């Protein structure tokens, strides 16, 4: 991919991406590595521009992830119990603190486009008659708003689904639909035979969980991107098709403020502190824990480093949920970037010096990639735990990347 007009090869930047926590089958690894590489390059093309903005870079990278059928976002997303695609997405700008999210939006190829525009309109305050710009839109209303702003391809939900719904997703939906029907029939029979008992209902729930776990490729919820530009501006975003067989209208982690992504240029007490975080997992318990915001806050307060903060938050939300009723998957992944930017000449703009990147995950695998101006090509990895499937724990990866020129 070649840089466009106005590209400045001396501009410093950094981009980190992930394609979800869960289990990534070896057969899909090549496709996932390819899409992460292309997402990194799409963001870098914008960040090398003199006028390139982090919001646009995050949006461009996530659009690449949404358009690829190997991810659970946009095309190839998990289907609702009704057999349709409903997407969640959000984007946050670290400088302004503005957040834009869309939830359960049907018939949209790139939900991140709507989220990005929501952020921009809040920053500019461009509304008629002084109305407050929306921060979160859901369902058909989000789709209509996107069409009114000309950020969506014209067409009906049915027409969009023809592109969004892949054969793999449809086959998975049919398989899960049959499983649910079978379990439902057994539950009715069990209730008739044991009207006051719960043992058989619990067995049915366990059967569903074990059948789902046996699926070859099980990727939980979101994809995400974090971008930092030459001046130390930071932004991040998330996008997701949601969990398989979700109830229509369910709004998940990727659309929720403070949960799916978080970016900030200041610490809790107002001092400069550049940090961005994206979270992936079975969303409800991560939403209750405000996982992305908590990770950034913990990092700013402890100064122990991104890896320590990510592992601490992941262990905390897992522990809080461990005593609650239910057999839902509690695995997750957290990707966090802390950036260092300083003013070299008094009165001038800050300049990006280095970043620290960390990934913490309790899942069997977590697909991550990153790229910066001092790196020859994107570094891509499907991180895999050495733990057995039944073992609980948190693994991590961390690296520090110096983005300053190596010679004068």
From Swiss-Prot:
It comes from the Eukaryota. Cleaved into an alpha and beta chain by autocatalysis; this activates the enzyme. The N-terminal residue of the beta subunit is responsible for the nucleophile hydrolase activity. GO terms for molecular function: threonine-type endopeptidase activity. It is an enzyme of class 3 (hydrolase). The record marks 221-222 as: Cleavage. One of its GO terms (biological process) is proteolysis. Its EC number is 3.4.25.-. InterPro entries: Ntn_hydrolases_N (IPR029055), Peptidase_T2 (IPR000246), Taspase1 (IPR037464). CDD domains: Taspase1_like. Pfam families: Asparaginase_2. Substrate binds at residues 250-253. The keyword Hydrolase applies. Keywords: Autocatalytic cleavage, Hydrolase, Protease, Threonine protease, Zymogen. The active site is at residue 222. Heterotetramer of two alpha and two beta chains arranged as a dimer of alpha/beta heterodimers. Belongs to the Ntn-hydrolase family. This is Putative threonine aspartase. It comes from Arabidopsis thaliana (Mouse-ear cress).
């Amino acid at each position: 991919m070649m840089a466009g007009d106005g590209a400045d090869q001396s501009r410093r930047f950094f981009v980190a991406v992930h394609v979800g926590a869960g289990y990534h089958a070896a057969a899909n690894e090549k496709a996932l590595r390819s899409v992460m590489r292309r997402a990194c390059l799409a963001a870098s093309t914008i960040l090398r521009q003199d006028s390139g903005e982090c919001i646009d870079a995050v949006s461009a990278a996530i659009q690449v992830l949404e358009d690829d059928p190997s991810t659970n976002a946009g095309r190839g997303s998990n289907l609702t119990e009704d057999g349709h695609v409903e997407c969640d997405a959000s984007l946050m700008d670290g400088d302004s603190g503005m957040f834009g999210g869309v939830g359960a939006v049907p018939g949209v190829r790139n939900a991140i486009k709507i989220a990005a525009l929501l952020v921009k309109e809040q920053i500019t305050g461009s509304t008629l008659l002084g109305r407050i710009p929306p921060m979160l839109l859901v369902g058909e209303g989000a789709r209509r708003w996107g069409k009114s702003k000309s950020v969506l391809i014209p067409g009906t939900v049915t027409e969009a689904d023809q592109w969004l719904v892949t054969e793999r997703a449809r086959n998975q939906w049919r398989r899960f639909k049959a499983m649910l029907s079978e379990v439902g029939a057994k539950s009715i029979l069990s209730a008739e035979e044991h009207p006051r008992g719960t043992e058989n209902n619990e067995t049915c729930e366990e059967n569903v969980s074990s059948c789902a776990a046996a699926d070859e490729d099980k990727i939980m919820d979101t994809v995400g991107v974090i971008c930092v530009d030459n001046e130390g501006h930071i932004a991040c975003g998330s996008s997701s098709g949601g969990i398989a067989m979700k109830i229509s209208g369910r709004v998940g982690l990727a659309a929720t403020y403070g949960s799916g992504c978080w970016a900030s240029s200041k610490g809790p007490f107002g001092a400069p502190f550049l940090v961005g975080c994206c979270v992936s997992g079975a969303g409800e318990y991560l939403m209750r824990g405000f996982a992305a915001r908590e990770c950034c806050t913990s990092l700013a307060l402890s100064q122990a480093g991104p890896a320590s903060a990510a592992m601490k938050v992941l262990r905390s939300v897992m522990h809080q949920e461990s005593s609650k009723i239910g057999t839902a998957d509690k695995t997750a992944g957290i990707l966090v970037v802390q950036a260092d930017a300083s003013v070299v000449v008094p009165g001038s703009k800050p300049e990006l010096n280095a970043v620290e990147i960390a990934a913490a995950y309790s899942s069997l695998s977590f697909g991550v990639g990153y790229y910066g101006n001092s790196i020859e090509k994107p570094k891509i990895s499907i991180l895999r735990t050495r733990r057995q499937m039944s073992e609980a724990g948190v693994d991590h990866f961390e690296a520090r990347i110096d983005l300053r020129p190596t010679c004068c």
